[in-house]
Amino acid sequence: AVYRTADVILINMPDIKLIKEDLKINIVGDYSFVDVTYVIQNNSYTDSKITYGFPIDYIRTDLQYEFEWQKEYLPEIEFYLDAKKLKIKHQVDYSIFEEKADTNDEQMLEMRRSWYIVDFNIPKGKSIILKVKYKIKNGFEDWATTKSFFPTFDDRRFIYDFKPAQNWDDGIIDELNVQINVKDIITKGGKVNISGLSFSESLGVYFASFKKYDLK
């Protein structure tokens, strides 16, 4: 992949509709395994060549200032179009911004955003299935990297942003399904705080489903 330092400008695609998004996140140990599947439809009268950017956000800590570029923070990322693997054209690094962990949290987290870029075509009047899979290390800072005399253990944090997908058509997804599996945390006696959407939970798996979900 080609690495660049810059920012990505998102362009509205009024004739390309995001029909469905299925997001599955499995949190195991210090890593989150993410599998997201999109059904995208070309409603225009011509074939559309798409340059697609997928953002991944890293929560920055003192440890990651030194090591965030190492492969251990994102050891795996793959794109598939209709089950055929796509080549990552290049990676664009990086935007630095601050964001709250959730709306009730006063703490601001410093984030780094990297964009992974692929090209694909959608024939006129047709739909495609785009899948993105990646493994990312959750943001945290533990006793080995702190300056405290006593060991301290920080929360593991993972953030997923739906907002970039608002540039498809009118920014409304016909169907959005989210599943977050935290069984590994629960069985080890850990606690989980999931915010942003309204979830139901069963045996350590959180579910949320929406129709006509507005990303704007």
What label would you give each PLM region?
Residues L10-N12, D62-R112, K191-F207:
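Solvent-exposed beta-strand/loop surfaces of large extracellular or lumenal domains
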Residues A1-Y31:
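N-terminal, polar/Ser/Thr-rich
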Residues V34-N42, V132, V178:
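Short, well-ordered beta-strand segments enriched in hydrophobic/aromatic residues
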